[in-house]
């Protein structure tokens, strides 16, 4: 007599996986918001910082380091596993939010955006590696489907939310308001991350394939 496998939904949102699933989706949503949702606040930002001519630079300062972070984060995950990346990258992303959110000059804002982008890239690829390690093969398509939604949703609701925050509070809170969510996301994924081990040299073949696939997925967004 054989027992049937539990439904995929139970693996994603059952007691043992609910926290890490929500944490993963939150981490990706935060990246997507910073990549696409802050555009509504940018006119107010450049006007406040008297840098209208530099309008495009905050976007470039996020996207270019994000690509670098994706590559370097993937290499680190390949060599040492995703555990350290999933702790350090959100910290770097959060530091970028703090620096950008307290910016009084365009130079400081650009530094914050560089930190955000680099942390987001490394964080994104590490999330994809974590999915490959934590979830069963039959559950991964469902997880990746949810992750795709986590990329799309901020592009739809991010701009109006960013506009409302900018109008009723300040553009600074478009960055600072995400800091508690970063802490929450790290707290949710930490139990799963803590149990991951560093891959031995002989085990890095499968890990490398997962990391390469994750890097492409993260770069594609």
Residue ranges and their predicted role:
Residues 168-221:
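Hydrophobic transmembrane-helix bundles of small-molecule transporters
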């Amino acid at each position: 007599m054989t027992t049937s496998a539990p439904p995929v939904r139970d693996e994603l949102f059952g007691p043992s996986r609910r926290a890490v699933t929500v944490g993963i989706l939150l981490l990706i949503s935060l990246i997507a918001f910073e990549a696409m949702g802050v555009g509504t606040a940018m006119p107010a930002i450049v006007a406040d910082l008297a840098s209208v001519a530099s309008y495009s630079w905050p976007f470039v300062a996020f996207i270019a380091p994000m690509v670098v972070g994706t590559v370097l984060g993937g290499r680190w995950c390949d060599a040492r596993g995703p555990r350290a990346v999933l702790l350090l990258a959100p910290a770097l992303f959060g530091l970028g939010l703090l620096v950008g959110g307290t910016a009084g000059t365009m130079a400081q804002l650009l530094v914050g955006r560089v930190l955000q982008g680099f942390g987001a890239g490394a964080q994104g690829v590490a999330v994809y590696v974590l999915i490959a390690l934590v979830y069963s093969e039959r559950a991964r398509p469902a997880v990746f489907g949810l992750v795709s939604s986590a990329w799309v949703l901020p592009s739809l609701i991010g701009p109006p939310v960013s506009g409302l925050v900018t109008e009723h509070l300040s553009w600074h809170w478009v960055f600072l308001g995400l800091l508690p969510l970063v802490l929450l996301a790290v707290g949710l994924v930490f139990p799963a991350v803590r149990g991951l081990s560093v891959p031995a040299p002989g085990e890095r073949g499968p890990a490398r394939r997962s990391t390469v696939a994750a890097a492409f997925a993260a770069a594609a967004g």
